[in-house]
């Protein structure tokens, strides 16, 4: 299996990503049998529900210390000690100490909403220039709303992929008035890069949620959470029709990998140069929640 590489934003170094359950992922996405099996898993939600139920059993706590060690996760950032987690899912949905993720200051600064690997495309209309032709992507299919497609079709898009070892709570990227969340039922295909390499439309087929944010600095912003293999539950902890500050918690994903997608209207944001440079090279940039993504063009 070809090793996955990304740019670590803290060091600006190219890093090879540790793949959780690498042998299983190789089987699922490099063999005919594996691809058939992965499709079966994605289209059979009861299997994800069973897996999620298992991960909430108390005996799964035994997996936590080894998982933390293998993935070099910093326990000093946790609100709880390792011994306090009631299950592996409880650990997976962990909260962090506020000081662990400082928020970039300035009303005109948009921040990363999650810990994850980021790809940024400043013009959705030119999306094909940044990805190989086999990676089909339909904004209409993703949003399922003609008025939203018209509104964001010439804007920008941010993809943030969360790995299994990441902190899985998602946050508001800007100061905003948050509208209600709309649920779109779908499958639970993996969003691992091995699965995405041939088809970006996985995002359009998976279970997802959409929330529109009203902002003063960035216009309207569309926020999507996309489920993935074994992620049957996207939990919203925010209350709709209220004002929030950037960095405030919006919700969390239960066990599994997942993705956040953010859409901006045209002419509203200038992304940070390093993120654009890496994305143009086809490299994800690993960011921490609260780091700058870009600044408002309306300043």
UniProtKB/Swiss-Prot annotation:
Q: What is its biological role? A: Catalyzes the formation of phosphatidylethanolamine (PtdEtn) from phosphatidylserine (PtdSer).
* Superkingdom of the organism of origin: Bacteria
**Mind telling me how this protein is modified after translation?**
Is synthesized initially as an inactive proenzyme. Formation of the active enzyme involves a self-maturation process in which the active site pyruvoyl group is generated from an internal serine residue via an autocatalytic post-translational modification. Two non-identical subunits are generated from the proenzyme in this reaction, and the pyruvate is formed at the N-terminus of the alpha chain, which is derived from the carboxyl end of the proenzyme.
Required cofactor names: pyruvate
Q: Which organism is it from?
A: Chlamydia felis (strain Fe/C-56) (Chlamydophila felis)
Q: Can you state the subunit structure given in the record?
A: Heterodimer of a large membrane-associated beta subunit and a small pyruvoyl-containing alpha subunit.
* One Pfam family from the record: PS_Dcarbxylase
Give the protein family. Belongs to the phosphatidylserine decarboxylase family. PSD-B subfamily. Prokaryotic type II sub-subfamily.
Catalytic positions?
115, 171, 258
Pyruvic acid (Ser)-modified residues are: 258
Question: What is the name attached to this protein's record?
Answer: Phosphatidylserine decarboxylase proenzyme
Q: What is its main location?
A: membrane
> Record's NCBIfam families?
PRK00723.1, PS_decarb
Name the residues annotated as site: Cleavage (non-hydrolytic): 257-258
Q: Read off the InterPro entries from this record.
A: PS_Dcarbxylase, PSD-B, PSD_type2_pro
Q: Which reaction does it catalyse?
A: a 1,2-diacyl-sn-glycero-3-phospho-L-serine + H(+) = a 1,2-diacyl-sn-glycero-3-phosphoethanolamine + CO2
Going by the UniProt record, its keywords in alphabetical order are: Cell membrane, Decarboxylase, Lipid biosynthesis, Lipid metabolism, Lyase, Membrane, Phospholipid biosynthesis, Phospholipid metabolism, Pyruvate, Zymogen
């Amino acid at each position: 299996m070809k090793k996955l590489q990304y740019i670590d934003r803290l060091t600006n170094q190219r890093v090879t990503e540790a793949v959780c359950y690498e042998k299983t992922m190789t089987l699922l996405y490099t063999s005919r049998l594996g691809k058939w099996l992965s499709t079966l898993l994605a289209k059979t939600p009861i299997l994800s529900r069973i897996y999620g139920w298992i991960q909430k059993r108390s005996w799964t706590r035994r997996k936590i210390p080894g998982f933390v060690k293998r993935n070099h996760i910093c326990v000093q950032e946790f609100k709880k000690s390792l011994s306090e987690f009631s299950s592996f899912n409880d650990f997976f949905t962990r909260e962090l100490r506020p000081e662990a993720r400082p928020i970039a200051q300035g009303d005109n600064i948009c921040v990363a909403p999650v810990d994850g690997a980021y790809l940024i495309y400043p013009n959705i209309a030119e999306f094909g220039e940044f990805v190989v032709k086999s990676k089909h992507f339909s904004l209409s299919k993703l949003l399922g709303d003609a008025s939203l497609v018209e509104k964001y079709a010439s804007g920008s898009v941010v993809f943030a992929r969360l790995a299994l070892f990441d902190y899985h709570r998602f946050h508001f990227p800007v100061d905003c008035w948050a509208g209600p969340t709309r649920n779109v039922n779908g499958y639970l295909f993996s969003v691992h890069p091995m699965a995405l390499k041939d088809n970006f439309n996985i995002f359009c087929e998976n279970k997802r949620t959409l929330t529109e944010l009203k902002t003063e600095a960035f216009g309207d912003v569309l926020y999507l959470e996309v489920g993935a293999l074994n992620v049957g539950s996207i939990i919203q902890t925010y209350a709709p029709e209220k004002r929030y500050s950037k960095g405030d918690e919006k919700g969390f994903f239960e066990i599994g990998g997942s993705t956040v997608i953010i859409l901006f209207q045209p002419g509203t944001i200038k992304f940070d140069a390093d993120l654009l440079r890496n994305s143009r090279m086809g490299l994800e940039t690993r960011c921490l929640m609260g780091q700058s993504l870009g600044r408002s063009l309306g300043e």
